[in-house]
UniProtKB/Swiss-Prot annotation:
InterPro entries for this protein: Homing_endonucl, Sporu_reg_WhiA_N_dom, Sporulation_regulator_WhiA, Sporulation_regulator_WhiA_C, WhiA_LAGLIDADG_dom
Signal sequence, renumbered to the chain: none
PANTHER family noted in UniProt: CELL DIVISION PROTEIN WHIA-RELATED
Keywords in alphabetical order: Cell cycle, Cell division, DNA-binding
NCBIfam families (alphabetical): DNA_bind_WhiA
Lineage: Bacteria, Bacillati, Bacillota, Clostridia, Lachnospirales
Entry protein name: Probable cell division protein WhiA
Origin species: Lachnoclostridium phytofermentans (strain ATCC 700394 / DSM 18823 / ISDg)
Role description: Involved in cell division and chromosome segregation.
Pfam families cross-referenced by the UniProt entry: HTH_WhiA (PF02650), LAGLIDADG_WhiA (PF14527), WhiA_N (PF10298)
Length: 313
């Protein structure tokens, strides 16, 4: 099962006690995958159409708990995809249609198409209702990448108006949601790991949140270890390169003027550097009598390099 589906499985089980929050979630589901059927300018039925059984199940339960409506469910083969089904939940009794339409404050936006249902901002004025609204939209039209691979949360809309409404709601939680046009759809997305954690908390997907956080912590630990290893490898390469040049300079001095022309301190460190090419400056300093520190060894080796450079000119 994908991580996105796990999140949806979890939020399907979330059911608000407050009626106004349930209305916000119903409005979100209908805005994402609902439409109305009209005749002579009058709304005859409200239909939710989805390929996702989780959406159908949640909508059915919300209608039952909120309005005591037992929705008619139609199951059809999906012509757009092989071996998949379409679930159609239809409310068509006049009183129920009127009650549902008015309670959810939905409205038809003819500029977006005769069937486009837009949610009135009054439905999501409370913070708790905003949470329910985001949860409903993610369930109906959202997806989330596996955190093992990448961090990405998105909800897809056919028009900018509904995308902008969600962006504004998510941003009210201090989360930086952005909108991108992908083909003919508007995608509201979040890519920062800690902000996706916040979104999971907003949707009350607490188990998924812990799973996401565990993966994120492990990834950060691995990245930290990799950076440390890379840094150490770079330091080793730097040390090896420096040691190779030091040895090359020392051998040039030996073959040109000999060590007898060096001071006692320089001769000692020159002999040690040749004898122990893999030793660190600290280790070389400890071999001297009396021992000297890393900076003292470095000073002598630089002096030898300077002598070699002078001889080459």
């Amino acid at each position: 099962m994908s991580f996105s589906k796990e999140v949806k499985e979890e939020i399907t089980k979330q059911m608000n006690n407050a009626r106004h929050c349930r209305l916000a979630e119903i409005a979100a589901l209908l805005s994402a995958c609902g439409h109305v059927i009209q005749k002579d300018g009058e709304i005859k039925s409200i239909v939710l159409q989805t390929e996702n059984i989780l959406v159908a199940r949640k909508y059915f339960t919300l209608l039952k708990k909120t309005f005591n409506i037992n929705t008619e469910i139609l199951i059809r083969k999906n012509k757009a995809g092989k071996n998949s089904l379409l679930f159609l939940l239809v409310v068509k009794l006049p009183k129920q249609v009127s009650l549902l339409y008015q309670a959810t404050k939905l409205s038809l936006h003819h500029e977006l198409g005769d069937k486009a249902l837009v949610v009135d901002p009054i439905v999501v004025q409370n913070t708790c209702c905003k949470r329910a609204f985001v949860r409903g939209l993610f369930l109906a039209a959202g997806s989330m990448s596996d955190p093992e691979k990448t961090y990405h949360y998105e909800i897809v809309f056919p028009d900018l108006e509904r995308a902008s409404q969600l962006q504004e709601i998510i941003n009210s939680f201090l989360i930086d949601a952005k909108i991108v046009l992908r083909k003919k759809y508007y995608v509201v997305y979040v890519k920062e790991g800690s902000q996706i954690v916040d979104l999971l908390n907003i949707m009350e997907a607490h188990t998924s949140l812990m799973d996401f956080e565990n993966v994120r912590i492990l990834k950060e630990m691995r990245n930290s270890i990799n950076r440390q290893v890379n840094c150490e490898a770079a330091n080793i390469n730097k040390t090896v390169t420096a040691a190779a040049k030091q040895i090359d300079d020392i051998l040039f001095i030996r073959d040109t003027i000999g060590f007898d022309n060096l001071t006692e301190g320089l001769e000692e460190i020159a002999e040690l550097r040749i004898s122990y090419p893999e030793s660190s400056l600290k280790e070389l300093g400890a071999m001297l009598n009396p021992p000297i520190g890393k900076s003292g060894v470095n000073h002598r080796l630089k002096k030898l390099c300077s002598i070699a450079d002078g001889l080459r000119q």
